[in-house]
Regions:
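Long, distal/terminal scaffolding or interaction modules
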Residues: 1-277
């Protein structure tokens, strides 16, 4: 086993973190990075250098909100485990790698992600999946506001976000493509509705599936609510199975619940505001 430390600027304090090098233990193509008290720049520098040096599994311990973990990684086959709380923009711009968080994740997970997979064994914050263009994100618990905003798809690149708990306002806002799933089976807020208000506001592409009941008053004027049909369930099943496998849950029990489909009624909901009809 090799212990090493990345080079860092002179010792100092930034936002409550010491500018210290993370302690790295490496064995073959796997490495553990202790990031206790380490600033996000030092952590991400260490991850990038390890991946460039042939490491395929990076285990991050002591995470306490350091942001940009896995951001910009374009190396398929690389896996990052985060033990603790993953900070803002985890997996941002990621293209092919996998990030698994054993804890909660803050805002912006999967921001503009192109491919790869993110698994969060906990809750996630706001703007989850912002502008995603591909890849898959699975969150075991509750999620925040504006989840799936501006998700988009192109040809075979179809982003997927599956949330096991409940969501707040503006779920699926301005969606242009992709698949957004809300299961409501793992939540800290059993007394609250599955989704907040303005669900699908401005949505003009893609589809949302919610396990349970969604009322018209909860949705934007740009979407319609229908019962999920057999074709919808055939799309849902493999996603629910992947979710269940990731978190050790029962896919059949989840699929037994009623699902509704939320989809746009127009692909140009605001055309009359900026173009002649």
């Amino acid at each position: 086993m090799i212990k090493a430390a990345v080079s860092v600027p002179p010792a100092g304090v930034i936002e409550g973190y010491r500018q210290v090098a993370p302690v790295i233990e490496r064995e073959g193509d796997a490495a553990t990075v202790d990031t206790t008290g380490v600033y996000f720049q030092q952590l991400n520098d260490a991850i990038r250098r390890l991946v460039a040096d042939g490491v395929t599994t990076v285990r991050v311990t002591g995470a306490n909100g350091q942001r940009y973990i896995g951001a910009g990684l374009r190396v398929p086959g690389v896996r990052i485990e985060v033990h603790g709380t993953a900070g803002n923009d985890t997996a941002m711009f990621m293209d092919g790698a996998e990030v698994e968080v054993f804890g909660n994740a803050q805002d912006g997970v999967g921001n503009t992600m192109s491919s790869g997979r993110v698994i969060v064994h906990g809750d996630a914050g706001d703007v989850l999946g912002y502008g995603m263009r591909g890849g898959r994100v699975f969150v075991q618990g509750d999620v925040g506001y504006r989840v799936g905003i501006h998700m988009k798809a192109y040809e075979k690149h179809v982003p997927v976000v599956v949330c096991g708990g409940k969501a707040r306002d503006f779920f699926g806002e301005y969606m242009a493509g992709g698949v957004l799933v809300l299961l409501g089976v793992n939540t800290h807020f059993p007394e609250q509705p599955l989704v907040g208000g303005f669900t699908g506001a401005g949505m003009h592409g893609g589809v949302m599936y919610v396990r349970g009941t969604v009322e018209p008053w909860q949705c934007g004027a740009e979407v319609g609510i229908t019962e999920a049909c057999e074709e919808d369930l055939s799309v849902l099943r493999p996603l629910v199975e992947e979710y269940a496998e990731a978190f050790g849950e029962d896919a059949e029990e989840i699929m037994d619940g009623p699902f509704v489909r939320i989809a746009p009624v127009s692909h140009r909901p605001y055309a009359k505001l900026y173009a002649s009809m």
